[in-house]
UniProtKB/Swiss-Prot annotation:
UniProt cross-references to SMART domains, sorted A to Z: ARM
UniProt superkingdom: Eukaryota
Name of this protein: Transmembrane and coiled-coil domain-containing protein 6
Gene: Tmco6
Keywords annotated in UniProt: Coiled coil, Membrane, Transmembrane, Transmembrane helix
Membrane topology: Multi-pass membrane protein
Transmembrane segments: 338-358, 386-406
Location(s), subcellular: Membrane
Coiled coil regions in record: 15-39
Disulfides per UniProt: none
Gene Ontology cellular-component annotations: membrane
């Protein structure tokens, strides 16, 4: 009798371990798929007053002769006012794609513009920089590459005294970085990383936002993991970014959002996330999430989801690289308030941005995967029922909810007893009727784990026409193994 029981226990233990191994393999593939990058974009700073534009579109198509004339006046006008006026006219013309092409084809045009940019006339410098900014917004890589002679000067001016000028240079660099690998290749030896590291010390919010934008564009380059991110990790930038994301009265949502995306791209590269962990990325992000959840409760709609999304992604991806024992040493990551904060955001997303629900659920999955503490928090805070209410929303949401529930159930009989009796079984039975094979497969896995640890659930499954539900799935060949396993367990315990 003892030997038979030992053998049966070994078989069940192997079954649980095999289920866990399979799910971890699937989750590894999911994690890889979720290391998605935000689409690159360009930003345009235009401060034309209505009276300057005359109530009409500022973009003016200029011919070659007109471009030459404005360049000549900008370079050799009778006085500074005439030169500035010529640059303003040129800038408006450069808002038109055809004028941009005319400009870069014109011999000596960029040399003339760079000459004005490097002059000692502040107003002319500013207008020349605005002309470059218009060019940087082009979608043609040839236009961006035509701006190569100006990049070293734009970098130099990042150490200047005018915050407005620095902001303009940063957005221009960010736009150029997106469009051309040649630009990025030139900027690296010119010292873009040290220049950015100096910029992050700025007290000006607009400069910091512009820096976050430019840095995020640099981090999304295809060559970033090999050629860019290592030097960024060796600089003071990661530590300073995390400092700017610390919750408190000085936290600026716009700045924090830009640098949260920067951290996301660094983490997704998997170059050396140990550096971020050493600088306290996990506790900083966890505390920020707690702070944001409190703000969501106090204020209705302040655009917090724009910051919450990258913060959730950063935490989710970092947790996959942290051993469970190390995670347990982080006080902020042992706090059940983190689970409560996640559910505040899930409720917020449900009402305001349903598309962001998977972000919160993915973090909840990674928190509960290897942590009995967080599974206990889900149970002690009575959050299983709110979780079950998310099942009907979409297949993606349903899949993640089922995965989180598997994390709880696989922790053993003590956890399953706290789930039973309750609405779990009936909710999961409903998912067996869904058309998504992956979701149904995850439901079968959850039921198998539940029956192994809670035999009463298997008996209730039979009483609620569970076998009939399984028979309807017989044509799904890829589910046959799980269906047979579940039928055997149900029959054994029923």
């Amino acid at each position: 009798m003892w030997n038979r029981r030992q053998g049966r226990l070994r078989t069940l233990a192997f079954g649980v371990e095999e289920l866990r191994r399979r799910r971890r393999e699937r989750e590894a593939a999911l994690r890889k798929a979720r290391r998605e990058q935000q689409l690159v974009s360009k930003r345009l700073l235009r401060e034309d007053a209505p009276e300057e534009v005359g109530g009409q579109s500022a973009a003016v198509l200029l011919g070659e002769a007109e471009v030459q004339q404005f360049l000549r006046l900008a370079q050799r006008g009778t006085d500074e006012k005439e030169r500035e006026k010529a640059l303003v006219s040129l800038r408006r013309g450069l808002q038109h794609p055809d004028t941009q092409q005319t400009f870069i084809r014109l011999e000596g045009s960029m040399r003339t513009l760079v000459g004005i940019l490097t002059s000692n006339r502040a107003l002319l410098q500013l207008e020349a920089a605005r002309c470059l900014h218009e060019l940087s917004h082009s979608e043609q890589s040839a236009v961006a590459e035509a701006c190569l002679p100006a990049t070293s000067y734009l970098l130099t001016y990042l150490s200047g005294h005018s915050s407005d000028f620095i902001e303009l240079c940063l957005y221009t660099l960010g736009n150029l970085i997106v469009e051309s690998e040649a630009v990025r290749k030139q900027l690296l030896p010119q010292g873009i990383v040290p220049a950015f590291a100096a910029c992050i010390q700025s007290p000006h919010v607009a400069v910091l936002e512009a820096l976050g934008y430019a840095l995020s564009q640099l981090l999304q380059a295809k060559e970033a993991p090999e050629k860019i991110i290592p030097s960024i990790l060796d600089s003071s930038l990661p530590q300073q970014m995390l400092w700017l994301m610390q919750p408190g009265p000085k936290l600026n949502l716009g700045v924090a959002m830009e640098f949260a995306w920067c951290l996301h791209y660094i983490i997704c590269s998997q170059v050396n996330n140990a550096v971020l962990l050493t600088h306290g990325a996990l506790p900083t992000l966890a505390l920020l999430l707690l702070d944001l959840a409190g703000t969501v409760q106090r204020m209705d709609d302040v655009g917090l989801e724009l910051l919450a999304c990258p913060v959730l992604r950063c935490l989710s991806n970092l947790l996959t690289e942290v051993p469970a024992e190390v995670m347990g040493q982080q006080m902020e990551l042992r706090d059940e308030r983190l689970v409560a904060a996640l559910f505040i955001f899930l409720q917020f997303f449900l009402q305001k941005q349903p598309a962001l629900l998977p972000e919160g659920l993915w973090l909840l999955n990674n928190l509960t995967a290897n942590s009995p503490t967080f599974c206990t928090s889900l149970l002690s805070l009575d959050l299983i029922e709110p979780l079950l209410q998310l099942l009907p929303l979409s297949n993606a949401v349903c899949m993640l909810v089922l995965t989180v529930l598997c994390n709880v159930v696989e922790k053993g009989p003590a956890y399953c007893q706290r789930l039973w009796p309750g609405p779990l079984l009936s909710c999961v039975l409903n998912t067996l009727a869904l058309s998504d094979t992956e979701v149904v497969g995850q439901s079968l896995e959850l039921l198998q784990l539940l029956f192994l640890h809670q035999p009463e659930a298997a008996r209730a499954f039979l009483q609620q026409s569970g076998l009939q539900a399984l028979e309807k799935l017989q044509e799904e060949t890829q589910l046959q193994e799980r269906i047979h396993a579940l039928q055997q367990i149900a029959a054994t315990h029923g």
